[in-house]
From Swiss-Prot:
Bilayer disposition of the protein: Multi-pass membrane protein
InterPro entries xref list: NqrDE/RnfAE (IPR003667), RnfE (IPR010968)
Subcellular location: Cell inner membrane
Enzyme class: translocase
Assembly mode: The complex is composed of six subunits: RnfA, RnfB, RnfC, RnfD, RnfE and RnfG.
GO biological process, one term: electron transport chain
Pfam assignment, any one: Rnf-Nqr
Keyword Electron transport: yes
Organism taxonomic ancestry: Bacteria, Pseudomonadati, Pseudomonadota, Gammaproteobacteria, Pseudomonadales
Entry keywords, A to Z: Cell inner membrane, Cell membrane, Electron transport, Membrane, Translocase, Transmembrane, Transmembrane helix, Transport
Function: Part of a membrane-bound complex that couples electron transfer with translocation of ions across the membrane.
Name listed for the protein in its UniProt record: Ion-translocating oxidoreductase complex subunit E
NCBIfam families in UniProt: PRK12405.1 (NF009070), rnfE (TIGR01948)
Similarity-based family: Belongs to the NqrDE/RnfAE family.
Length: 238
């Protein structure tokens, strides 16, 4: 596997084909658990681990599973790995496990995981499949983390609250409160606020992509000379 392959998989997972911002998969946990940083980070890490491990497992058994039972077999693999993560969370982060509730076992039905198993892991070697799962999971976790951080900050006026649920007593004083007198904005931590914030993040990503595409056209000389000066001044092609 070449360095170019690694870079391409990383770009797809983190930005170009991000599960949360581009594919719009896994929206149920993405919107349901992103009301705080600790919830978002906990579910994001769990999903990333299941995705990386399931991709590796599917790649290993892809030649031994017939076409007729491929999807049920993949679901069983994902369910087994999700159960392992669930048991680990019960043992080490039980309070966070209770907070996340049904969203941990629901990782089994996350479309991101089954989609990567079917579209990528079943057609590639273990190394490529594992790296794809890791980067896709990381991209999903980062969207969860950004969304959770923004919603917590706007809704409660804090950041990194209750991080001891994930990292233990040492993280009890990680809480940041930039605006001590802030009364909070209830909409931000409710489901409608999650939809609004996700929509704004998607719009921001699309705008960045458009700007990068316009700059690439200018650098490649595809923009007429009469427009180049305006692009340099405003950054926009009209």
């Amino acid at each position: 596997m070449s360095e170019q392959d690694f870079r391409e998989i990383a770009r797809n997972g983190l930005w170009r084909n991000n599960p949360g911002l581009v594919q719009l998969l896994g929206l149920c946990p993405l919107l349901g658990t992103s009301n705080s940083t600790v919830n978002a980070l906990g579910l994001g890490l769990a999903t990333m681990l299941v995705l990386a491990c399931s991709n590796a497992a599917v790649s290993l058994v892809r030649g031994a599973v017939s076409e007729a039972i491929r999807l049920p077999a993949f679901v069983m693999i994902i369910a087994a790995l999700t159960t392992c993560i669930e048991l680990l969370m019960q043992a080490w982060t039980y309070e966070l496990y209770q907070v996340l509730g049904i969203f941990i076992p629901l990782i089994t039905t996350n479309c991101v995981i089954l989609g990567r198993a079917e579209a990528f892991a079943a057609k590639n070697g273990v190394l490529r499949a594992s790296f794809d799962g890791l980067l896709m999971g990381l991209g999903f976790a980062l969207v969860l983390l950004v969304l959770g951080g923004l919603r917590e900050l706007l809704g409660q006026g804090t950041l990194l609250a209750d991080m001891h649920l994930l990292f233990g007593p040492a993280a009890a004083d990680w809480k940041i409160q930039p605006f001590p007198q802030y009364q909070g904005f209830l909409l931000a931590i409710l489901p409608p606020g999650a939809f609004i914030m996700l929509g704004l993040l998607i719009a921001l990503k699309n705008r960045i992509d458009e700007s990068l595409a316009e700059r690439a056209k200018v650098q490649a000389g595809d923009v007429p000379a009469t427009q180049r000066q305006r692009v340099r001044v405003t950054g926009v092609i009209e």
